[in-house]
Structure formats: structure tokens, C-alpha cells
């Protein structure tokens, strides 16, 4: 728990100069009534400012933002986006513009919720295409058949197979290795 804000869920954890995890609360502070406005609130102002400042000041080689739902701009329509970053365009633009305009290096996103697994670019082209996201899933859930529509060049890997995912940060090689392992223990990516 946070020492002065015991109900606050968002926080960060650091492993030396190698990795810093930024854990978000993207459910408890969201304001759906603002979704389509210029002031869309996906995260509270305090949490957004904390994330922006943390990413800017972090000296960790890899900065992994852990979020319950994806920030990727998917090439298909999946609902109206009210439950993910895509539905809060102003908030999504604020954090992604902050990262790209300040040239913050080593930022990755890790999320789930779509009942599929993938590794890909946040956007198919433009400055945000350098940012990457890993979706963990489907776990033990029924796979989302939309994984079949996630193809290169935006997506390097997609699966509907039940699996778990690991990340390995190697600062000496400047690599963050993503590994998906199926129920039989076989690496599928």
C-alpha cells in the first residue's frame, strides 16, 4: 500500500538501472462521461501527471507500463472503445505525445483483457509506431477470434492459443525479450 494514500493502486517498482514497472489503475479513476471530450479522463489528473513525470525521469533502460486494457490502435472495430484507451482519445494522445515529443526511450506497454496474445506496434505508421505493446492472453479463456486479423506489419505475433507470457530484460544487449509459452510448456514466440 501507498504510505499516505492507502486506496491508491498505481505505483512503480524498479529493478536497478534495468527495468521500471509503472502499474496503472485504469478502472477506478476513469470518467466515462468525459470519454469523447478534449478533457477525457482515462486516468485521474494526479495519476496521469505521475506517469508522465515518472517516464520522463526514469533512468531505467526499460520502462514497462502495465495496464489492464490495451493502448494499441487496433485495425478493427471492437466495441466503441469505452473500456480502453482508444475510447479516450485526448488522454491517449496526451501520454503518447508526451513520450514521443520528449523522445523517452525504452517504453513498452503490457496489458491484456482482449482474450488474445500479441506483440505489436501501437500504431501502424507514424512516430507512435516505434512504441510497442504486449497483450497477455487469452490465459484460460475462450480465445477472441479477432486475433486472426492482427497481421504484419503492425503485429509481429498473434495467438488465440492458451498461454502465458514472460518478459526478460537484458540491459547489456539492450533487449527486452518477449516469450509466449503454451499449455504444453512449448515456446510459441
Language-model segments: which ranges?
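Metal-dependent phosphoester/phosphodiester hydrolase catalytic core
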Residues: 1-189
Amino acid at each position: 500500500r501507498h504510505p499516505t494514500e492507502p486506496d491508491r493502486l498505481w505505483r512503480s517498482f524498479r529493478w536497478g538501472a534495468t527495468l521500471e514497472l509503472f502499474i496503472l489503475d485504469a478502472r477506478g479513476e476513469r470518467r466515462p462521461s468525459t470519454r469523447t471530450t478534449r478533457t477525457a479522463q482515462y486516468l485521474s489528473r494526479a495519476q496521469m501527471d505521475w506517469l508522465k513525470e515518472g517516464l520522463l525521469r526514469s533512468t531505467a533502460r526499460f520502462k514497462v507500463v502495465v495496464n489492464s486494457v490495451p493502448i494499441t490502435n487496433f485495425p478493427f472495430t471492437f466495441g466503441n472503445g469505452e473500456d480502453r484507451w482508444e475510447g479516450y482519445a485526448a488522454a491517449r494522445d496526451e501520454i503518447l505525445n508526451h513520450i514521443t515529443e520528449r523522445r523517452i526511450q525504452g517504453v513498452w506497454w503490457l496489458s491484456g483483457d482482449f482474450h488474445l496474445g500479441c506483440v505489436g506496434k501501437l500504431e501502424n505508421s507514424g512516430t507512435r509506431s516505434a512504441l510497442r505493446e504486449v497483450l497477455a492472453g487469452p490465459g484460460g479463456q475462450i480465445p477472441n477470434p479477432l486475433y486472426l486479423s492482427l497481421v504484419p506489419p503492425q503485429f509481429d505475433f498473434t495467438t488465440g492459443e492458451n498461454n502465458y507470457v514472460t518478459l526478460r530484460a537484458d540491459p547489456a544487449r539492450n533487449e527486452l525479450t518477449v516469450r509466449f509459452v503454451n499449455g504444453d510448456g512449448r515456446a510459441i514466440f
